[in-house]
A protein has these predicted regions:
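Peripheral interaction segments used for macromolecular assembly
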Residues: 1-71
């Protein structure tokens, strides 16, 4: 697990919810938000990042909470 200091490093990385669901890949970072493209387009604040294992970003949100950020 690593701490993220530069959010731009996360572009093209996979994103999973705390319950293990795959949300897709980060396609853009703007300010403190990540745009994720998968089954749905989401714009999720980076404050919901739990950890990054070097290949995937894990969130503190479950799938239902994450879909509230649909764009």
């Amino acid at each position: 697990m690593s701490t993220i200091h530069d959010l731009d490093r996360l572009v093209r990385k996979g994103v999973r919810t705390k319950d293990g669901n795959d949300l897709g890949n980060i396609i853009a970072v703007d300010g403190s938000n990540m745009t994720i493209q998968g089954r749905k387009m989401l714009k999720i604040p980076s404050t919901y990042i739990d950890f990054y294992n070097g290949s995937e970003v894990f969130l503190t949100l479950d799938i239902k909470e994450a879909f509230k950020y649909k764009i």
